[in-house]
From Swiss-Prot:
Top-level division of the source organism's lineage: Bacteria
Pfam families per UniProt: Lum_binding
Name by which UniProt lists this protein: Riboflavin synthase
GO biological process assignments: riboflavin biosynthetic process
Broad enzyme group: transferase
Length: 207
């Protein structure tokens, strides 16, 4: 589990794609990382399989490549890194699982004087999970939804977040990894199951 508070901007050293997935090597300043540790890389939970000096290497599964922007990384690109939350630590952002739901393109990204306004477009079927003033994780960053208009999500980015994450390198058309709020998923899942039970009960009464 993660908090969505980026600890370091890692620099991609190498990405090797194969039929079995990929190996991703990232140079980082993160300390106290061991083999087998979970690290959020652009919001995707990956396992450290090799450590050489300041470089961490991860295995990336085909499913993760399919759901995220990791397969599009190039040498020199920057990725958001966060170590897994430890028991007793403060939850400064929101609960982020590291399970990316989908990627969304940047539709606009503008500086409005005191903050940046980021607009992404999400698939219609996922819009039910994104609500005004709710939490959302973009490339592993815990952010608050300003408002939603149709399938477009508007998010305000403060300068500190912009400068300390890979958002400073993003432009229109780039894909961001999106993880919707886990609490919303549980609520929707519960309501869907409740509705199915009600439908079954109504059918039973017809007999």
């Amino acid at each position: 589990m993660f908090t969505g508070l980026v600890e370091d901007l890692g620099k991609v050293k190498n990405l090797t794609l194969s039929s079995k997935g990929a190996k991703l090597s990232v140079e980082t300043k993160l300390e106290d990382v061991k083999l087998g540790d979970s690290v959020s890389v652009n919001g995707a939970c990956l396992t450290v399989v090799d450590i050489k000096s300041s470089t961490l290497t991860f295995d990336v599964s085909p499913e993760t490549l399919k759901r995220t922007n990791l397969g599009k990384l190039k040498t020199g690109d920057y990725v958001n890194l966060e170590r897994a939350l430890r028991v007793g630590e403060r939850l400064g952002g929101h609960i982020v699982q590291g399970h990316v739901d989908f990627t969304a393109p940047v539709k606009s990204f503008n500086f409005l004087g005191e903050h940046y306004e980021l607009v992404i477009e999400i698939p219609e079927e996922w819009s039910i999970y994104v609500v005004e003033k709710g939490s959302i994780a973009l490339d592993g960053i815990s952010l608050t939804v300003n408002y939603v208009k149709e399938n477009k999500v508007f998010i305000n980015i403060i300068p500190h977040t912009y400068k300390s994450t890979n958002l400073q390198f993003k432009k229109v058309g780039d894909l961001l990894n999106v993880e919707t709020d886990i609490l919303g998923k549980y609520v929707i899942n519960y309501l869907n199951k409740l509705k199915k039970k009600e439908d079954i009960f109504k059918e039973f009464l017809k007999w």
